[in-house]
Structure formats: structure tokens, C-alpha cells
């Protein structure tokens, strides 16, 4: 009977689909009320559950004449990253099928990425890269924490594997790249490490590249990996919390490589987009979020989507436990709790965090920033505040003018001043900006 399920699936699915996703799919165990299938790849397990669940259920019903629950398990012995005995690198690329990599989140797809006008062009470029890998190369995406960079990066990986199943797609964090390099040195497998990253990947996607700031040895290895992949026409996609010019502590030659292709910013979602995202997050948890609650969340929570999702999850859990309707009262209660612990709720004013960080780094108080002093250090602090508010937090010129008490023309001039300093490689400005951003990132992570 178990063979019958496999036969039914083969008939229902296109040959290409079967070859791409079902070659390791098999029946492991059958009980009176449940069937357990096994696959040889963790990503395939998640992919089959999310994309082919209904097909599998129908095949079970056809084979057994009734509906049965099923489970897909991943069964394989977990290899060591580097095997000391044979010095053979056992990285995350699947050799039997040119799929992948490290784990991808099955929810991080283009279909689940809510697109607003602020990121429409970025979305379309990402789709085009998925359709035609190598067209925009490299592709560098930057933006503040929690805006969906990882989602977008993994969506590109998912789509390339869907449209180009023959391609080997490697998604990693920069920390993973560093750890793999360290292991290769430890176990004498540097050659295998380089073979893995430079020869076996058709698409390389690296998340959180800013992690490698100051890590010169790893940057050198990445530089040569980048060059070899680029020269071979392989697609490279990189994400960072800041634009390439602000990667202070990176080799100039590596920064210049990042700037060779398409560099785009992912912007904080506007209020209408946050409303749609809130509805989407709840829908993913099988909950229909009332419009007034979604609007309240969109009004109250800033662009950090991790915080927005956290509020929604807590809202759903508390509603379920207390048998309480999801409404404005419960939402306000949960927002108040988050308000005590995070700066991502608008009532806590992100500009206060930036100004307090500038005070710690530059020794200039918020009062001095908002004042009229023309002392060089105060003017620079004021300009850095305006630049960060605009480029990293998506504030409008009008909003920045209101926060700082300065005229629109002053705000525009200040932002352009910092932009030009960064582009021209002004060491003082780049170092101060990097220190402020790093301090803020550390504070956010600690919170």
C-alpha cells in the first residue's frame, strides 16, 4: 500500500517536480491513523509541507480510501562541519540534488512579502534577479534592523530554486562563513572550504555582512571568494544594516566590490503598509485581525517588523489563554507592556535613542543639538542626527525639521553634507557614523 502512495504521487506530479523535490521522499511508517514519510534534506521537508501538503493528503485518501494524518521527518546522520579524519568538508550544500545550503524559512517567500510603495522597486529588482541570476551582480541590500532584509534574501533563494532547480544556491550568514573558515583552518581543510564556496555555488547569498567589520582575515578570504564567483558569472546577493560606504572597518577593495552592481535600500514600511503587514502576520497564524486592531498596531509600532510580529503573537496567545476577544483594549494592554522594554514603539521616540547615543559618542547633549551653536563638533552631531533619521529611519524632511527645530533647507543641506563626506571617504565622519550605528545596534540587540 505504501508503494501505491508513491505511485499516485508520481502520476499526479510533473516529472520535473518529482525529480526536483520528491526523489528522497518515501514512506517510513504506517499506523492505523497516521503515515510518516521521510526525506533526506531538511529544506525539502519544509518545502513539501508548505507547497505540496494538499497533494500528499489527496494521494493518501486515494490509496487508503480515507483521510489520514501524516508527518514528514528529516532523517540523516548529521555530518561534522569538517571531518578531521579525511579532511573532507561536509558543508550544507546537498550533493545529490543542487538545492542548498543552510536552512531557509519556508515562510520567507515573495508571496509572503508585503509590498508597499516605499519598497516596490526593490521588490521588482529582487524578482528580476531571481528570474535572471547574474543580471544585477552583485546585489547589495541595506537597511535598519527588522525591515525584512532576511525575508527578501531568502525569498530570492526560494524563487531561484523554484525557477532554476539546476542551480546550487548557498544562503549563509557572514558569521557562518567565518566559522566555516575557522573550522577549515583547525582541521586542515582550507582547500575543501574554498572549493565549497568558490566552486560549488551558482548563487551565493550572504546575510548580515556587517558582522565582519574589523575581521581582516575573514574579509580577505571573502574578497577572493567574491572575485572568483563574480568572474565566473555567479550571482552574489549581500545584506547589511548599513550602506557600503558606511562599512567602516572593511577593506576598501571589498567595499568597492559591493558597489560594482546594484545597491538598494530597504525602507521602513509606511503606515498603510504596516497595516497590511499586521494583517498578513495574523493570517499566517490562522487569525483574522480586526481592521481597527491592525490600524492601532500600524499607528503604534514603528517599522521594526520583528517587534510588530512579537506584539501580534503575544496578542494571539493572550487572547487564547484568557478567552478574550482581540480588540483595542487588549491590544493597548500589550502595547503598554512592550512600551516598557523596546524603543520600537513610537511613543518611546526613536530620535531620543539616537540623540542619547550621539551624546555618548560625541559628547554633545540633545539640548546642544537643538540649539544654535556653530561649534564644529556640535554641528557635526546635528548633521549626523539628521542623516540617521532620514537614511536609517525613513523620517521625512518635515519630521526631521520638527524634531530638531531647524528649517527644511538646513535639514536638506545637513543630510547632503554627510552623504558627500561618506562618499568622499572622510575618515572622521565615517568613523563617528559607524560608532553611533554600532552602539545603537548593540543597544537594540540587548533590549
UniProtKB/Swiss-Prot annotation:
<dbReference type="Pfam" id="PF00308">
    <property type="entry name" value="Bac_DnaA"/>
</dbReference>
<feature type="region of interest" description="Domain III, AAA+ region">
    <location>
        <begin position="103"/>
        <end position="319"/>
    </location>
</feature>
<feature type="region of interest" description="Domain II">
    <location>
        <begin position="66"/>
        <end position="102"/>
    </location>
</feature>
<dbReference type="Pfam" id="PF11638">
    <property type="entry name" value="DnaA_N"/>
</dbReference>
<feature type="binding site">
    <location>
        <position position="150"/>
    </location>
    <ligand>
        <name>ATP</name>
    </ligand>
</feature>
<dbReference type="GO" id="GO:0008289">
    <property type="term" value="F:lipid binding"/>
</dbReference>
<dbReference type="InterPro" id="IPR013159">
    <property type="entry name" value="DnaA_C"/>
</dbReference>
<keyword id="KW-0446">Lipid-binding</keyword>
<dbReference type="InterPro" id="IPR027417">
    <property type="entry name" value="P-loop_NTPase"/>
</dbReference>
<dbReference type="GO" id="GO:0006270">
    <property type="term" value="P:DNA replication initiation"/>
</dbReference>
<dbReference type="InterPro" id="IPR013317">
    <property type="entry name" value="DnaA_dom"/>
</dbReference>
<dbReference type="InterPro" id="IPR020591">
    <property type="entry name" value="Chromosome_initiator_DnaA-like"/>
</dbReference>
<keyword id="KW-0235">DNA replication</keyword>
<keyword id="KW-0547">Nucleotide-binding</keyword>
<feature type="binding site">
    <location>
        <position position="146"/>
    </location>
    <ligand>
        <name>ATP</name>
    </ligand>
</feature>
<dbReference type="InterPro" id="IPR024633">
    <property type="entry name" value="DnaA_N_dom"/>
</dbReference>
<dbReference type="GO" id="GO:0005737">
    <property type="term" value="C:cytoplasm"/>
</dbReference>
<dbReference type="GO" id="GO:0006275">
    <property type="term" value="P:regulation of DNA replication"/>
</dbReference>
<dbReference type="InterPro" id="IPR001957">
    <property type="entry name" value="Chromosome_initiator_DnaA"/>
</dbReference>
<dbReference type="GO" id="GO:0016887">
    <property type="term" value="F:ATP hydrolysis activity"/>
</dbReference>
<comment type="subunit">
    <text>Oligomerizes as a right-handed, spiral filament on DNA at oriC.</text>
</comment>
<comment type="similarity">
    <text>Belongs to the DnaA family.</text>
</comment>
<comment type="function">
    <text>Plays an essential role in the initiation and regulation of chromosomal replication. ATP-DnaA binds to the origin of replication (oriC) to initiate formation of the DNA replication initiation complex once per cell cycle. Binds the DnaA box (a 9 base pair repeat at the origin) and separates the double-stranded (ds)DNA. Forms a right-handed helical filament on oriC DNA; dsDNA binds to the exterior of the filament while single-stranded (ss)DNA is stabiized in the filament's interior.</text>
</comment>
<dbReference type="InterPro" id="IPR010921">
    <property type="entry name" value="Trp_repressor/repl_initiator"/>
</dbReference>
<dbReference type="InterPro" id="IPR003593">
    <property type="entry name" value="AAA+_ATPase"/>
</dbReference>
<dbReference type="Pfam" id="PF08299">
    <property type="entry name" value="Bac_DnaA_C"/>
</dbReference>
<dbReference type="InterPro" id="IPR038454">
    <property type="entry name" value="DnaA_N_sf"/>
</dbReference>
<dbReference type="GO" id="GO:0005524">
    <property type="term" value="F:ATP binding"/>
</dbReference>
<feature type="binding site">
    <location>
        <position position="149"/>
    </location>
    <ligand>
        <name>ATP</name>
    </ligand>
</feature>
<keyword id="KW-0238">DNA-binding</keyword>
<feature type="region of interest" description="Domain I, interacts with DnaA modulators">
    <location>
        <begin position="1"/>
        <end position="66"/>
    </location>
</feature>
<feature type="region of interest" description="Domain IV, binds dsDNA">
    <location>
        <begin position="320"/>
        <end position="447"/>
    </location>
</feature>
<keyword id="KW-0067">ATP-binding</keyword>
<protein>
    <recommendedName>
        <fullName>Chromosomal replication initiator protein DnaA</fullName>
    </recommendedName>
</protein>
<dbReference type="GO" id="GO:0005886">
    <property type="term" value="C:plasma membrane"/>
</dbReference>
<feature type="binding site">
    <location>
        <position position="148"/>
    </location>
    <ligand>
        <name>ATP</name>
    </ligand>
</feature>
<keyword id="KW-0963">Cytoplasm</keyword>
<dbReference type="GO" id="GO:0003688">
    <property type="term" value="F:DNA replication origin binding"/>
</dbReference>
Amino acid at each position: 500500500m505504501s508503494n501505491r502512495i508513491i505511485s499516485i504521487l508520481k502520476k499526479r506530479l510533473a516529472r520535473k517536480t518529482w525529480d526536483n523535490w520528491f526523489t528522497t521522499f518515501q514512506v517510513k511508517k504506517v499506523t492505523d491513523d497516521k503515515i510518516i514519510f521521510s526525506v533526506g534534506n531538511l529544506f525539502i521537508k519544509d518545502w513539501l509541507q508548505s507547497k505540496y501538503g494538499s497533494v500528499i493528503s489527496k494521494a493518501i485518501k486515494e490509496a487508503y480510501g480515507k483521510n489520514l494524518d501524516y508527518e514528514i521527518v528529516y532523517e540523516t546522520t548529521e555530518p561534522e562541519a569538517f571531518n578531521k579524519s579525511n579532511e573532507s568538508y561536509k558543508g550544507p550544500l546537498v550533493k545529490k540534488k543542487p538545492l542548498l545550503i543552510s536552512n531557509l524559512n519556508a515562510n520567507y517567500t515573495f508571496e509572503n512579502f508585503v509590498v508597499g510603495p516605499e519598497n516596490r522597486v526593490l521588490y521588482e529588482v529582487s524578482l528580476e534577479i531571481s528570474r535572471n541570476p547574474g543580471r544585477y551582480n552583485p546585489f547589495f541590500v541595506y537597511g535598519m534592523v527588522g525591515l525584512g532584509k532576511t525575508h527578501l534574501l531568502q525569498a530570492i533563494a526560494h524563487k531561484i530554486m523554484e525557477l532554476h532547480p539546476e542551480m546550487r544556491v548557498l544562503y549563509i550568514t557572514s558569521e557562518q562563513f567565518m566559522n566555516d573558515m575557522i573550522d577549515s583552518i583547525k582541521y586542515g581543510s582550507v582547500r575543501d572550504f574554498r572549493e565549497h564556496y568558490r566552486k560549488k555555488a551558482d548563487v551565493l547569498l550572504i546575510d548580515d555582512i556587517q558582522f565582519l567589520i574589523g575581521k581582516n582575515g575573514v574579509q580577505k578570504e571573502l574578497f577572493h571568494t567574491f572575485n572568483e564567483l563574480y568572474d565566473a558569472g555567479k550571482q552574489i546577493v549581500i545584506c547589511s544594516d548599513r550602506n557600503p560606504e558606511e562599512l567602516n572597518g572593511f577593506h576598501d577593495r571589498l567595499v568597492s566590490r559591493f558597489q560594482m552592481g546594484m545597491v538598494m535600500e530597504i525602507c521602513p514600511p509606511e503606515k498603510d503598509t504596516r497595516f497590511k503587514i499586521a494583517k498578513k502576520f495574523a493570517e499566517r497564524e490562522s487569525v483574522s485581525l480586526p481592521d481597527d486592531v491592525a490600524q492601532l498596531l500600524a499607528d503604534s509600532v514603528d517599522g521594526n517588523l520583528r517587534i510588530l510580529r512579537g506584539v501580534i503573537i503575544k496578542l494571539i496567545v493572550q487572547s487564547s489563554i484568557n478567552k478574550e476577544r482581540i480588540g483595542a483594549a487588549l491590544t493597548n494592554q500589550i502595547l503598554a507592556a512592550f512600551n516598557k522594554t523596546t524603543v520600537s514603539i513610537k511613543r518611546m521616540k526613536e530620535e531620543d535613542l539616537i540623540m542619547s547615543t550621539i551624546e555618548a559618542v560625541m559628547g554633545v547633549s540633545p539640548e546642544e543639538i537643538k540649539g544654535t551653536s556653530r561649534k564644529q563638533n556640535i554641528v557635526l552631531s546635528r548633521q549626523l542626527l539628521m542623516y540617521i533619521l532620514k537614511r536609517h529611519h525613513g523620517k521625512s524632511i518635515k519630521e526631521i525639521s520638527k524634531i530638531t527645530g531647524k528649517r527644511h533647507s538646513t535639514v536638506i543641506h545637513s543630510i547632503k553634507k554627510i552623504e558627500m563626506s561618506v562618499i568622499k571617504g572622510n575618515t572622521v565622519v565615517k568613523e563617528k557614523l559607524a560608532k553611533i550605528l554600532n552602539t545603537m545596534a548593540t543597544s537594540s540587540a540587548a533590549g
